[in-house]
Structures are given as structure tokens and as C-alpha cells.
Amino acid sequence: ITIDEVQAAHGSLKLMANVSWEYDKLPHMLIAGGTGGGKTYFILTIIEALLRTNAQMYVLDPKNADLADLSAVMPEVYYRKEDITACIERFYDGMMERSETMKLMDGYKTGENYAYLNLPPHFLIFDEYVAFREMLTTKENAAVLNKLKQIVMLGRQAGYFLILACQRPDAKYLGDGIRDQFNFRVALGRMSELGYSMMFGEVDKDFFLKQIKGRGYVDVGTSVISEFYTPLVPKGHDFLKEIGRLMQQRQDGQAACGAKAAGTD
């Protein structure tokens, strides 16, 4: 499908004609991609689609590469080590706080999630995760892993979701069963046998390497691995411009709502 057809609604994000990420039911996405696999475009496509909803996003790009450029057009984009660590902590605190306040809300019902209470989902989009972990001291690593573990275990109900991307999902940095908490896993571009087994576990499947940008394999949370093609980005599509436009629209909308609420409309 083309990127205009990538739409998020009712806790589900459509990514291919027959592939959606049902983040409300099967939370957290893990993306692995070798160079030239189309990983960055795929992440930008997700950001653009989620901006059309009421989702709140936080973008972490420790290599200060393409995603860091988004800081020109949207808030909550970080690339410095300290800022990234602080953002993870804020995201975690926000999740814990929401879990508490949800229980006190009028419409709260046991077993219902954030969407039932009309709260917006929050997404922490973390590129080059392995590269980031390699920059940290042992102590810092433990603190970050602890927070991420809590987020993947507790985030679904409160609507706090993690999208983690890396070149290859090194077991060293996705240990302690944290990898299994990522229900939607996509491997883009060419990966080694080891890369695939780190991504999908030990599977009896032959992976064919076709030289097509944006092609890979996906497990949508059903433990069935199928071929995957990232949404097509038309030539000349300017993500920065489009994301900036959507961000502006959103701010204008909020300003209008604010004015209305203040009775100045």
C-alpha cells in the first residue's frame, strides 16, 4: 500500500493490505533492519500516520541521524544521551501516573483500557536502541533496562507503547524475556540467520533475501512469520514538510479548542 493508506484507527495501524499492527491488543513493536532496508522510512511513515490521530509521540535518535532532524518540526525529539535517558524516565513516570489516575476517573471500569476513557495513546519511538545501550555504563544500562521492562509489561492498559528499532536485535540488550514482550516484530532488509533467530526465536523457516528496498519479514503477534513490504513512499515525498504540516494542524486545532473553552471563540 502507499503511505496515504497507512491509517491508525481503533487501536490498530494498517501497514499492508492484510497486515495491521493491533497495538491495543498486541502492544510494542520491534524493528530490525540492516542498512538500506528502509527502516528509517518505515519509522517516518509510522510517525506520519500516528500524527493524524491524537497520539502523543516521543522520538529518540541516539545517532543524531535522520530522525533527529524532526526536532525542527515537532517537540519531544532527542538525540543526546542525557536527554534520551530523561525522556525514558518521563515516559515511564507518565505511564505510572496515568495508571493511577485512570482508576479515579468517572468512566473507569476494571479491564477497560485508556481508549475506553478517551485518553490519547503515547508512543516512545526509539531508533538505534543497541547503539544507545552501547554508550552507557553498566549502572546506566541497568536503570534504562529496568524502565523499559516496566513499560513493555505495564504499558498496554495505560496506552504507553514502545517502538524499538535497531540494526540487529542483540540478545545482550534485549535479554530477560523483554524481547518476547514485543508482539509485532518486523525484520527489514538483509539479515543474517542469527539476526532472524534473535528476532523471531528459533523458527523452522527459510528466509529468502531478495534485493528489494523495504522488504522483510513480519510476525504480527501470532507467531506466524510472513513476507512484509513497507508502505510505498512516493518519489519526492518530503517527510519533514508533511510532519511539520500535520504538527501545525494539530497545534491550530488545539489553539481553536483552547479559545473555544475560554469562551473567546
Describe each region flagged by the PLM.
Residues I1-K103, H122-F123, V130-M191, F200, ...:
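P-loop NTPase catalytic phosphate-binding loop
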Residues N18, S223-E227:
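Short, mixed charged/polar active-site loops
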Residues E100-P121:
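Short helix/loop segment immediately N-terminal to the Walker
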Residues G195-Y196:
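Conserved beta-strand-loop-alpha-helix hinge in the C-terminal portion
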Residues D204-T222:
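Conserved C-terminal "switch" segment of AAA+ ATPases
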Residues A255-A262:
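Phosphate-handling catalytic cores of nucleic-acid transaction enzymes
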